[in-house]
Swiss-Prot record:
Gene3D superfamilies in alphabetical order: 3.30.230.10, GHMP kinase, C-terminal domain
Pathway stated in the Swiss-Prot or TrEMBL entry: Isoprenoid biosynthesis; isopentenyl diphosphate biosynthesis via DXP pathway; isopentenyl diphosphate from 1-deoxy-D-xylulose 5-phosphate: step 3/6
Catalysed transformations (reactions): 4-CDP-2-C-methyl-D-erythritol + ATP = 4-CDP-2-C-methyl-D-erythritol 2-phosphate + ADP + H(+)
Gene name in the database record: ispE
Record-given protein name: 4-diphosphocytidyl-2-C-methyl-D-erythritol kinase
GO biological process assignments: isopentenyl diphosphate biosynthetic process, methylerythritol 4-phosphate pathway; terpenoid biosynthetic process
Source organism of the structure: Trichormus variabilis (strain ATCC 29413 / PCC 7937)
Active site residues of this protein: 11, 141
GO molecular function: 4-(cytidine 5'-diphospho)-2-C-methyl-D-erythritol kinase activity; ATP binding
EC number: 2.7.1.148
Sorted UniProt keywords: ATP-binding, Isoprene biosynthesis, Kinase, Nucleotide-binding, Transferase
Length: 317
């Protein structure tokens, strides 16, 4: 019975700007997405029967059709029925290390790993572009999670333009286990409060995306200047999430007050907050200081770093 083990990295947003509405109900976005070393492990085994099974070590993660992992396997079975019939179903085990409901694309990266794993398991020979296109059916973050590294994402987040890779910028990441922020609520609230500023013309949308691509944060990424990147971090959703979630604001302010932190921001729609540091020792020092200041066991703190890849295959049996 064949099987594959894959690594599925989390992502953070270095930049998130909401620039308009879309006919499909989503928003027009300009984002800079970055893979980090915090990752889940996915094991995929072939089954003799045409069934899909999902297991997970985290009690908050469902294992039915509401899980994006299940839907990714179901999508592959639907798109490639002959391979599904020939090779059988799949048994998928998710070993969670990425915090759940954290704005770190944990579900999306797990789904991306399933697409990559089933492609290998069924000998489909799909290209990365084809895998990204399948991922876009599942969710806006899935194409990026397939690709990984450092990219500008536009549209609803599925249109990717690679940037020079950023490696070994150290990060302290914090997330309250019991705290969740609804992504739908965050975007809906932003639309209600700031929708009057949205760009309406498609040429204006394209121009704004191009301006970010040629702007100062991308220049800093090209030059691998961590301090300059940290100074240009931007997330529009902070405007609605921080006033409504005092714990997220408190954590962000505490990170910002640390001398070794060169920049801090909420990732995605939250509630995760990250801080950039110039080296691992400083990141570990910040983690220790924040833990002493907020001894609450509900607060998870991780030291991680930027990486240059998306889904990785560890091996097969």
């Amino acid at each position: 019975m064949r099987s594959y083990k894959l690594i599925a990295p989390a992502k953070i947003n270095l930049y998130l700007e909401i620039i308009g509405d879309r006919p499909d109900g989503y928003h027009e976005l300009v984002m800079i997405l970055q893979s980090i070393d915090l990752a889940d492990e996915i094991e995929i085994h072939s089954l003799s029967s045409e069934t899909i099974r999902v297991h997970c070590n985290h009690p908050q993660v469902p294992t039915d059709k509401s899980n994006l992992v299940y839907r990714a396997a179901e999508l592959m079975a639907t798109k490639f029925p002959e391979a599904f019939a020939k090779y059988g179903g799949v048994d998928i085990t998710v070993h969670k290390h990425i915090p759940v409901a954290a704005g770190l694309a944990g579900g999306s990266t797990n789904a991306a790993a399933v697409l990559v794993g089933i492609d290998l398991l069924w000998n489909l020979g799909l290209t990365q572009t084809e895998l990204e296109e399948l991922g876009s059916i599942l969710g806006s973050d899935v194409p990026f999670c397939v690709a990984g590294g450092t990219v500008i994402a536009t549209g609803r987040g599925e249109q990717l333009s690679p940037l020079p890779n950023l490696d070994h910028i150290y990060i302290v990441l914090g997330k309250y286990r019991s705290l969740e922020v609804s992504t739908a609520w965050a975007y809906k609230t932003y639309r209600q409060e700031y929708g009057s500023t949205y760009l309406r013309d498609t040429n204006d949308l394209a121009s704004r995306a191009a301006a970010v691509h040629s702007g100062s944060i991308v220049k800093a990424i090209v030059e691998k200047d961590a301090v300059a990147i940290a100074q240009k971090l931007h997330n529009d959703l902070e405007k609605v999430v921080l006033p409504s979630y005092p714990q997220v604001l408190q954590l962000r302010e505490l990170f910002a007050s640390q001398p070794s932190v060169i920049g801090t921001m909420m990732s995605g729609s939250g509630p995760s907050v990250f801080a950039l540091c110039e080296n691992q020792a400083q990141a570990e020092q910040v983690q220790q200081q924040v833990r002493q200041t907020i001894p609450d066991e509900d607060l998870e703190l991780f030291v991680t770093r930027t990486i240059t890849h998306g889904i990785q295959v560890l091996g097969n049996e």
